Structure formats: structure tokens, C-alpha cells
Swiss-Prot record:
The lineage of its organism: Bacteria, Bacillati, Bacillota, Bacilli, Bacillales. The gene is yttA. Induction: Negatively regulated by TnrA under nitrogen-limited conditions. It comes from Bacillus subtilis (strain 168). Keywords: Cell membrane, Coiled coil, Membrane, Transmembrane, Transmembrane helix. This is Uncharacterized membrane protein YttA. Residues 140-182, 191-202 have a biased composition (Basic and acidic residues). It holds the Pfam family LMBR1. Residues 61-178 form a coiled coil.
């Protein structure tokens, strides 16, 4: 899945760059401006997001695989060194046994000295092998911990991915619900405004014209004022709003 995301991201980026290069060449040669930013930028940015997402998801698996390979190689080397150590142990015991037998034989002093030197060299080699084995054991332990950590990080990333997908679904559901609530609220508000307007029209019949004059029912210009700026329920209310009575 991670490789598919990375491949799709790379392909989208490649198409976007090809599209941009094609229109750049056409602009240079023919001065044509038909480049669509709405097509180029979403395709290019979406490709980068897919590419980086695929690479990020694939990285923990790669790290775990590399750790497993290193662990296998070190384990094989550890077994080889252990085998060599056992062989040297046998050889050391054999040389020690021969040295003990030749110790009382004065005629073989040279051979005894040679065996002592060999024995000393074997001890040094044995000590070096023990140090290497200890180091390999520590490296082996560290690789086990690295592999365990890589697997844990991989599992954490998968859980985060699942959590993000669930959050995305929840957000989409909330968005759809919000649109429905908004539509319902708008309808209720419109009905409320219509009701208020009707009530005002029935009880408040003093018209305020746009030139600052109010007209009461039965006055000369009352019926002629067909588009009042405001409606008032009383003369006091109209005068308080800055309107005056007509001169005639």
C-alpha cells in the first residue's frame, strides 16, 4: 500500500511538471497563455503529499528489515567465532597437556619453550576472541532492541493512520450535519422575519418617507407614498426617529 501511494504521488508530480514544461515551451515559442493553475497546483501538491506519505509509511518497515538482516549476519558471525573459540580451547588443552608431559624431559626444552610461546599466543588469541564475542553479543542485543523499536514505531504509525481516517470520516459526517442544520436555521429565520413584518404592517401604519416626512392614514400624501423608508406605530415614534409632519 505504501509503495502504491508513493508511486501515485511520483506519477502525479511527473504529470504536473510535464504539463508545466509543455505550456512553458508553448509560451516561449508562440506566446500562448493557456496554463491552468487549478490543474497544475492541486496535481503537483497532491503528488508530493502522496509521495511523502508513502515514503514515511514505508520507512519503518525498511528499518525493521535492515535490522533483521544485520542481526542475522551478526548471529552467523557469532556462531563462527564461537566454533573457532571451541577449537582453540581444544588445541589449548592439547598443547597444555603436551607441555606438562615435556616439562620433566630436559632434552625437549626447546620444544617446551616453543609450546609455551604457542600457548601464550593462543591465550592472547582466546582473549581477543572473547572480546569480539562479547562485542558481538552486545551488538546482537542492540539490534534486537532496534528491531523491536522499529516494529513498535511501525505499529504506532499504522494506528495513527487509522485514527486519522476515523477523524476524517467523523469530520465529513459533522460537515454534512452542519449543512443540514444551517439550511433548517435559514428557513426558520426567514419565517420569523416574515411573521414580524406582517405584524408590523398590521399594527404600525404611519409611513415615513425618504425625505424625512411622516404621513398618517387619511393624509394627502399617505396613499401616494408607496415605498416608505420606515413604518411607525405612533406619531411620537416617528418624531423621535427624526421625521416631521407635512406642512399641508
Amino acid at each position: 500500500m505504501e509503495m502504491v501511494l508513493a508511486f501515485l504521488g511520483f506519477l502525479a508530480c511527473l504529470i504536473a511538471l510535464g504539463y508545466g514544461l509543455y505550456h512553458l515551451v508553448r509560451y516561449v515559442l508562440k506566446k500562448e497563455k493557456r496554463f491552468s493553475k487549478r490543474l497544475f497546483w492541486p496535481l503537483f501538491i497532491g503528488g508530493l503529499v502522496l509521495l511523502f506519505t508513502g515514503a514515511a509509511l514505508a520507512e519503518p518497515d525498511t528499518a525493521a528489515a535492515n535490522a533483521e538482516k544485520k542481526y542475522s549476519a551478526l548471529n552467523a558471525e557469532y556462531k563462527n567465532l564461537t566454533k573457532e573459540h571451541e577449537e582453540l580451547e581444544k588445541e589449548y588443552k592439547s598443547v597444555s597437556s603436551e607441555a606438562k608431559k615435556l616439562k620433566d624431559n630436559k632434552e625437549d626444552q626447546d620444544k617446551l619453550e616453543k609450546l609455551k610461546n604457542e600457548n601464550s599466543d593462543l591465550k592472547k588469541t582466546q582473549k581477543s576472541l572473547k572480546a569480539e564475542i562479547k562485542e558481538l553479543q552486545e551488538n546482537q542485543k542492540q539490534l534486537k532492541e532496534d528491531a523491536k523499536t522499529a516494529k513498535a514505531e511501525n505499529e504506532t504509525l499504522r494506528q495513527d493512520k487509522t485514527k486519522l481516517e476515523n477523524q476524517l470520516k467523523e469530520t465529513e459526517s459533522q460537515t454534512a450535519s452542519s449543512h443540514e442544520d444551517t439550511g433548517s436555521s435559514s428557513n426558520n429565520t426567514s419565517k420569523s422575519d416574515e411573521t414580524k413584518t406582517a405584524d408590523k404592517a398590521e399594527g404600525c401604519n404611519i409611513k415615513g418617507s425618504r425625505n424625512g416626512i411622516y404621513h398618517t392614514p387619511g393624509s394627502t400624501y399617505y396613499d401616494r407614498t408607496t415605498d416608505p423608508a420606515e413604518m411607525f406605530c405612533s406619531v411620537e415614534e416617528a418624531e423621535a426617529a427624526g421625521y416631521r409632519a407635512p406642512k399641508r
